[in-house]
Structures are given as C-alpha cells and as structure tokens.
A protein has these predicted regions:
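Extracytosolic ligand-binding ectodomains
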Residues: 2-7, 11, 22-381
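Sec/Tat signal peptide C-region and signal peptidase I cleavage site
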Residues: 16-22
Length: 381
C-alpha cells in the first residue's frame, strides 16, 4: 500500500512538473561564423543579427514554446576550421546551423551538415553553393546568378559598351566574376581588362593602373570589404573618373567607414540594406545600432532574417524535425505581413535559393542611399 502511495505521489509530482519542463526546454541553433581573420566584419555582423533575433524570439515565447539556445563558434575565416566546427555542431545536437558567411567555408562545412541531415543557412553568395544538389542548404541572401544580371542591366542603362573588372581570387570573387561576364553578353558589353587580386591584398596600385590603362567605360569591383575599401582609395589616388560599380559589398557600411570620401559615387546592387525605404528594415537598423553601437550592413540583416525564417518555417511544420523542416523550405513563400521578423516577402526554390526585392544603392556624402528598388524575379508570377 505504501509502495502504491509512493508511486502515486511520484507520478503526480512528475505530472505537475511537465508544464515547467516544457517551459525550460530549449532548441539548439549553432552559428559557425567568421569572428576573426579576413571575414571578421562579415561574420560579426551576421552573428550579431542572429543574436538580436534570438533575443526577440525568446522574449516573445521562443519557437513552439521552446527557448532558442544560440551559440556561435569562430571559424577564423578558415574553411577547414569551419568543417571541424560543423562536426562539433552536429555532435552537440544542433537543430539548425547558421553560417558560415564566406563562400569558401560553407562549400566545405556544408558537406558535414548535409551528411547529418541538418538544415544549414549561409550568408555566402557564390552560385556554386546551391548547385551541389544539397537539400539542406539555404541562403540568407540573393545568389550571384540573380544579382549579376541586375548589375549588367544597370551598366547597359549607363550606355557602357566596355568594362574593366577587378575581383578577388577566391570562391566568392571567381564565382561572381564568371557570372557577371555571362550577364554582360546579352547587352553586348565587352570586357577590356580582367584583373585578379588576392584575398587580404594590401597594395592595389597595380590593379588600378591596369584598370585605368584599359580605358573602359566603367569599372566593376567585386572583392571583400577591406579589399574594396583599399581599391576605392587607390582609384581616387590615381584620379580614376569613370563609373565604379559593384555588387553588395562595394557600398556596404564597413567599406564606407574604411574608404572615407573615396567611397563617394560608388554604386552597387544590394540584396539587403539597412538604408532601404522600408519601415520594418529601418526599425531593425535602429534596434541593431542601439544593441551593438554600430550600424549593421547586409550581413547583419542576413543573420537576423535567417533566424526569423527558421522560426516561421518550424512553426509551419509544427515540430522540431530537421528533415521535415528542409522539405518545407523548398518552395515556401513567406510574407512579412504574417511574419514581421523576416522583414521582406521571400520565396525559396528547390535548390535553397531565395528571391525577394533588392536595391540599387549609391554612396552620397559618406552614406549609402537607395536610388532604386528592384522587384523580385517572381513578382507578378
């Protein structure tokens, strides 16, 4: 009888504990981000955006009543370190992995998350990322294949017949350069100088001199942030006076800070910008700056919206099932009206590429200004 009583009391105690247990359960989302090395600017922005989203999500009750437990590991901007950290994230029971941002790193690390069937969001823009048949990889930004035709169209509108190219010789730079050159073909724009530079390169005098000597109608610059700023400073130093056009990085906040007045006049297509004429994005930028004491760039938006996409799709699925989540991501359409945290309406295709509005921007008086809002490719379909 006493045993029965003890069992009954134990059973009642466990039953009463269930609501508390449910409240304290958490779901692990692990970031693999560039917090040091050449990608520190990108990775820190991405990570801070993700952390801000997690703070808000948890304050609002979490995801399906579960608190988000987000931790980030530093890839040191090294692909092999990223790969090792991906294995650790799998061992630690990650539901979703966020990052890396650099294309070269995600190309290596996503092999591990794919093998473990864990959804993986990346800030990388190289087209090759989503061309590997990986059903668990998803972007937080437009692919180069979507962005470069918009840059080529802008050059065509400038009546440019020739162009010089300065690009970084890494997965990001080479991939973008290749797609950009293809995007020029329908417009009949010829490449007069194809100039490769190294990641982390400091001296751009030779590259800029080659671009000047080519005497093309415009210059396309496609490098990472620090290199872009150095290129702009050298261009102004050598008196370059033709249009300077880029994609995403060239007019980013970090480049403007590093290049100073040399950034003025630069034009770039961007998939995301804190300066977009959108109340939701402006509110995000204000919250981010208040939280971290610096202005976010496109990578901050990637981390923030990526985390909210995880929340939205998980809640549609109704459970924490990585495979079901990945299946639901393919072909999903999410509206900012229904899910404000995603900031902009977005769709994902079968490859994990996303589509949404984007922007043409220009640096004016040391600030990025939006000069045009471009529709998503799926608009009107």
């Amino acid at each position: 009888m006493r045993s029965f009583a003890r069992i009954s009391v134990l059973g009642l105690s466990l039953a009463l504990a269930q609501p508390l247990l449910a409240q304290t359960q958490s779901v692990k989302i692990i970031g693999l981000v560039e917090l040091s090395g050449t990608g520190a600017t990108s990775g820190t922005n991405f990570n801070d955006g993700a952390k801000l989203a997690v703070k808000e999500i948890n304050a609002a009750g979490g995801i399906l009543g579960h608190k988000v437990e987000y931790t980030a590991s530093d890839t040191q901007s090294q692909p092999q370190v990223a790969k090792a950290l991906a294995v650790r994230a799998i061992d630690d029971g990650a539901y979703v992995v966020m990052g890396p941002v650099f294309s070269g790193s995600i190309m290596v690390s996503m092999v591990e998350t794919r093998r473990a069937e864990i959804p993986n969001f990346t800030g990388g823009e190289a087209a090759a990322i989503t061309q590997q048949g990986n059903p668990y990889i998803f972007r937080t930004s437009l692919t180069q294949s979507t962005a470069m035709p918009k840059v080529a169209r802008y050059l065509d509108n400038l009546k440019a017949k020739t162009v010089a190219i300065i690009y970084t010789n890494n997965d990001f730079g080479k991939g973008g350069r290749d797609i950009f050159m293809k995007a020029l073909e329908p417009h009949g724009i010829k490449v007069l100088a194809d100039i490769s530079t190294d990641p982390g390169q400091v001296d751009f005098s030779g590259a800029v001199l080659k671009a000047k000597q080519a005497n093309a109608d415009a210059l396309f610059v496609y490098t990472n942030e620090e290199e872009a700023a150095r290129t702009l400073r050298e261009l102004r130093k050598q008196g370059y006076d033709k249009p300077i056009v880029g994609e995403t990085v060239l007019t980013s906040q970090k480049v403007i800070e590093l290049a100073g007045d040399a950034a003025n006049g630069a034009v770039a297509h961007v998939g995301l910008t804190a300066d977009a004429p959108d109340p939701g994005i402006r509110a995000f930028a204000s919250k981010f700056e208040k939280e971290y004491n610096y202005k976010p760039d496109h990578n901050g938006l990637k981390g923030y919206t990526g985390m909210y996409i995880v929340k939205a799709v998980t809640e549609r699925v109704g459970k924490f099932d990585p495979k079901a989540f990945a299946d639901a991501m393919h072909g999903v359409r999410l509206s900012a009206k229904e899910y404000p945290g995603i900031l902009m309406d977005v769709t994902f295709d079968k490859n994990g590429d996303l589509d949404r509005e984007s922007f043409m921007t220009k640096v004016v008086n040391g600030k990025q200004a939006v000069i045009a809002t471009l529709p998503s490719l799926s608009a009107g379909k």
